[in-house]
Each structure stands twice: as C-alpha cells, then as structure tokens.
C-alpha cells in the first residue's frame, strides 16, 4: 500500500496538477476585451469654473472640474452609469447655487461626447460622435 501511495504522490499527483494548470490561466471575465468606455469632452466658455458630473437617475458620478476658457477630457465606463447607456451631464458652476443639466442622451462604447458650455448655460450644445 505504501508503494502504491508513493507512486501516486510521485507520478499521478504532479500529472493531475499539470493538467489543471491551464484551467487557471483561462480568462473568466464576462467583460469584453474592448473597453466599454465613452470619452466626454467639456469646453467651458462660461466665466465660472464648472464641476461636471455624469448623472443617471439619482446617481451622480463626478467627472472633474473644467476651468473657464478651457477644455477637459474625461473617460467614463458604461457600467458605471447604466446598462442602457442613458445619462445626463450636469454642470455645477463653482460659487453659484444654480446647476445646469443636459437633456438625456444614450451613449455606446467608443463614442465621444462633446459638451460646450456657454455664458448662458441654456445655450450650451451637446454632440455625440461615433
């Protein structure tokens, strides 16, 4: 019995471990290889600096701050916002109590959103490019 157990430990166990090794190297992710991100570019023509958020229903994701007369680019993963890709952008002027929210948009992986904030925020423009 000891010889049989010794052969198991010496030959069969290492063979089983070698056979199981490739299974540990298989990628088990359900996320596709290509990134599920959108690029959001915000140009600020308003005299106030803006803190920009992506909004989905009641959830806000802070993207960053855009200074006056500058443009910032942000990357947002789609699974951070919603499975449908629906979101709104919110501009919160620094030092003001008023905020401005874009109309709802639907974005898909790889798309680029360009938001140009004007002096009168109601005249701001939003463009989606593939």
Identify the role of each PLM range.
Residues 42-46:
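Asparagine-centered strand-capping/turn motif at beta-strand->loop junctions
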Residues 19-39:
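Bacterial Sec signal peptide processing site at the extreme N-terminus
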Residues 72-79:
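Exposed aromatic-hydrophobic patches
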